[in-house]
Every structure is written in C-alpha cells, then in structure tokens.
Amino acid sequence: MTNATTLTDLTIAEARDAMAKGAFTPLELTNAHLARMEAGRGLNAFITETPDLARMQAERSGERLRAGKAGPMEGIPIGIKDLFCTEGVRTTAGSKILDGFVPPYESTVSANLAKAGAVMLGKTNLDEFAMGSSNKTSASGPVINPWTRTDDDEQLVPGGSSGGSAAAVAGRLAMAATGTDTGGSIRQPAAFCGLVGLKPTYGRCSRWGVVAFASSLDQAGPMTRTVRDAAIMLKAMAGHDPMDGTSAPVEVPNFEAVLSGDIRGLRVGLPRQYRPEGLDPEIAALWDRGAEMLKDAGATLVEVDLPHTKYALATYYIVAPAEASSNLARYDGVRYGLRVPGETLDEMYCKTRAAGFGEEVRRRVLIGTYALSAGYYDAYYLKAQKVRALIAQDFKTAFETVDVLLTPTTPSAAFGLNETIDDPITMYLNDVFTVPTSLAGLPGLSVPVGLSSRGLPLGLQLVGRYFDEETVLNAGLALERASAFTQKPAFLTGALEGQI
C-alpha cells in the first residue's frame, strides 16, 4: 500500500488504521499528497504551500507513532483554509489588504488539529474574506472544480467560500481540510465537489484566530470524503475555548464512536417550504430519493413547516453584511497588511481600502454600513434580527416532532466559471437552503447522494438540534451507505491531467 495514487485515495480512518499497523509512515503519506499538490496546481486550490513544514510535522508524527503516543489524526495531511491564522505562515483571507501578513499566533482550531497530530500541507484558497459562493472573488484567482460535465469541458466553480478546501479534498491533494461556514460556505462547496461537509452548531468550534466575517454566524467545520472522517476531524477541532466568548462550554463527545448507521425509529422532517415553485426537477427527485433511502433504513418521514423560511435570505443579507462592515473596519493600513500612502490619514485609509478590498467585499461593506446607519438601523438591522429569532423558533418547533431535517443542499449542481458572474442576486440564491440553518445556529451536514444528468455531484443536507451532531452524523452515515456514492471527478480519471 505504498503506491502514491493508492495513498491519496485513502480516507482518514483507513490511513489512521494502516499507519497504526506500520503499513506506511506519515512521511510517505505526506510525500504522496505533496506530489499530488504539485500535479494539481492548475486547480489553484492552495494560496500557500508548506511542504517543508509538512515533512517536519510528518517526521514528528512518525516518532509519536513509534512511541505509542499517536493522536487521533496522527500523520493525516490536511489543508487549512486561509482564514485561519497560522503562526509563522502568511494568512491572506483571500484579500490584497492582508498582503504580507504573517500571524504571530495560531488559531485555536488549527492548534487543536496540530495537537491531534494532523500535518498541514498549506493554506487553501477562498472567496475574499469568505464572502462568496463561487471562489471567484479571491485575490489569488479562482479555484477550479475537479469535476467536469459529461457534455462539455467548461471549467466549473467549486462553490464557496471554502472552494479551495473543497477542490483540494475532492482532487486528493489533501485527505481533508478545514472550512468555515457563515451562510453555507462548507456545505455548498461540499455539495458541488462531491464531499461531506459539516457546519457544526454555532459555538462548537472556537472562532479565536479565524479572520472574522459575520461574528454571530461564522463557524469552523471539517470537509472530508466520508461521514466517518468528518466525525473524526470534528472531535479533533472542537472544544471550549476561553479565548472565544461565543465558544460553548459543552462536552465534546466521541463522534466516531456513536456512528452505527442504525436509524430505525428516527423521525426525519421534510420542510414543505424547501420545495418552492421552480425547484430544479433533478434536485426535487434527489430529495425524494434521499427521503426514500432513509425510510428504507427504518426512519419515519414527517412533513414539517418552517413558515419564515421565505425571509431567510433577505435576513441573512442584512445581518451578515452589517457584521462584516463592523469587522472589516479594522483594516486600515496602519498596523499590518497593505498600505497605500496618502497626503492625509483619511486619504491613506480610503486609498488602502479601495486598493485592498475586492468588488464583492466593498459591496457587502456598503450594504452593511447602510443597514447600520442611524436612519435605517431599526428598519433593516433590528427588523432582521427579529425575523432571525422567528426563523430559529420555527426550527425549535419542528424539532418537537422530528429528530433531523432532510433538505437539498443547493438549488443546482456546480455552474460554469463564467456563469452568473455579473448577477450577485443569482449568486446569493445558491445559499437558499443553507442560510436558514446558519441563522438558527444549528448543525448542518451535506452528504453526496448522486449525480446530475450532466455527471456532476449533488448533495442533500441533514439538519439537527443544537449540539446534536451525533444524530446528524449517524443519519448522514445511513444516507451515505444507501446512496453508495463512490464516483470520482474527471481530474482523477485522467480527463484533466493534461491540463495540469
């Protein structure tokens, strides 16, 4: 089992068990992925590669394995989304305004993963400041989805904002990667790239050291190729952190240990409002098929109402930009990052922010500033927060009669790199099924279930109660087993090899 291609196809669980038996070393596993990264640079999945650091960490992992002191992710090569501060390794958040910024400290999540033995291959690409659904707003250029349609060779988006993480894992450049999810930024790219993506309950993973977008929504989570791997990685990432005032002081269970796939008696809710007029027939059929899979596995299907769902997108696109406008006020060119000289301090601020922020970030900062302005605060931001509370109450009511919800993850399969680029509203609609879960702070899991008629992966989303990731993951395992999704992107079958 030392063939490089074979090594990069392994799951975290398979690699962990094989290394424990001495089948190969962490360094061999890391070198296989570094070679894959070099071959796959055309995907633009990484902003910064750290091969020397990765090899050093892999060697130390080997020493711990030999000493019988292996961590739960010992020797597993992963990507870290370039929104997580990494001590001594530049962090850009996909923006020009953080040019040259090298953090003097480590984010809690990446530190937890390092303590668990994970090996960092590099920092993955993302939409600028995690604002986007396509990974086209990155100052480092767009990420290419490893998947292609069966009827054309147009390059596709991987989704966003965690598109680099998604492309890296789908393309076997990394075994797993961290993502962040504000309104769907883990789940949507996971669906577009045929991966498992988990947004944990808000407060499950620390936000300390994660560059902020919308502080009441941002949540770190794992992006993997299997549900079991997501469970393993979440255990390593999670935990109360006194450095983060929103980190929940709750016990972190062994998510992998409770995975059985037995969902007999599980009550699965199907929200009526998630089947709007004009829903893509393929998405509707996939949802129906997924529901039948869970029913065949012993679950009971129950229709539920989430009446305020129709207001979720409008609410999100007031709350998130408002928080972003406040968070991004700190980028002024004074203490770190890009600085464009000006004759006055105000001119320096203006020139720096104009040159440093991309179009989408500027758009959201302006929207947020407007929503928070004295004359409009009550009409927009305050009203949005009230509607957000109603959306959360809808979920609470639904969970009185069901254990999990099953919905589509996205309204379509991955779209072309040059599609919808000039239409921000159409782009925002990509989050229509994921945003309500984020507003409520609930855990949401996207699982690949099938392919579209054009050969692209499609995912379904499972939503659970607060801090009940165990039930969500177990239902996800049942769905994963029933769907038996094993297809690989064209990048792995040779169709793109000549382009990379």
UniProtKB/Swiss-Prot annotation:
> Where's the active site on this chain?
K81 (charge relay system), S161 (charge relay system), S185 (acyl-ester intermediate)
State any single GO MF term. ATP binding
Q: Name one GO biological process term.
A: translation
Q: Which SUPFAM superfamilies match?
A: Amidase signature (AS) enzymes
What keywords is this UniProt entry annotated with? ATP-binding, Ligase, Nucleotide-binding, Protein biosynthesis
GO CC term, one of those recorded: glutamyl-tRNA(Gln) amidotransferase complex
| Enzyme Commission numbers on file | 6.3.5.7
Reactions this protein catalyses = L-glutamyl-tRNA(Gln) + L-glutamine + ATP + H2O = L-glutaminyl-tRNA(Gln) + L-glutamate + ADP + phosphate + H(+)
Q: Using the UniProt record, name the top-level EC class of this enzyme in a single word.
A: ligase
On assembly, the entry states: Heterotrimer of A, B and C subunits.
UniProt lists the family membership as follows: Belongs to the amidase family. GatA subfamily.
| Task performed by this protein | Allows the formation of correctly charged Gln-tRNA(Gln) through the transamidation of misacylated Glu-tRNA(Gln) in organisms which lack glutaminyl-tRNA synthetase. The reaction takes place in the presence of glutamine and ATP through an activated gamma-phospho-Glu-tRNA(Gln).
Protein name per UniProt = Glutamyl-tRNA(Gln) amidotransferase subunit A
Q: Report the source organism.
A: Rhodospirillum rubrum (strain ATCC 11170 / ATH 1.1.1 / DSM 467 / LMG 4362 / NCIMB 8255 / S1)
What is the primary gene name for this protein? gatA
